[in-house]
A protein has these predicted regions:
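N-terminal globular core domains of eukaryotic regulatory proteins
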Residues: 1-53
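Conserved active-site motif detector
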Residues: 57
Length: 57
């Protein structure tokens, strides 16, 4: 059965629906948010560019 969880990535809220546990989805959201924040701070880029750079990294 799918679980629904609201997560925050770089201050934006997203609703995830997946068969994974809510705690796992929160952990993934936190990881993505941390990585995007690192990219934005290091490269001085906006959220969209940070998302692309995080995805390819």
């Amino acid at each position: 059965m799918a679980n629904r969880v609201v997560i925050s990535i770089c201050g934006e809220e997203y609703t995830l629906v997946a068969d994974e546990t809510p705690s796992y989805m929160q952990k993934v959201g936190g990881y993505v948010s941390d990585k995007m924040t690192d990219v934005m701070n290091a490269a001085k880029v906006g959220r969209t560019d940070a998302a692309v750079l995080t995805a390819v990294n």
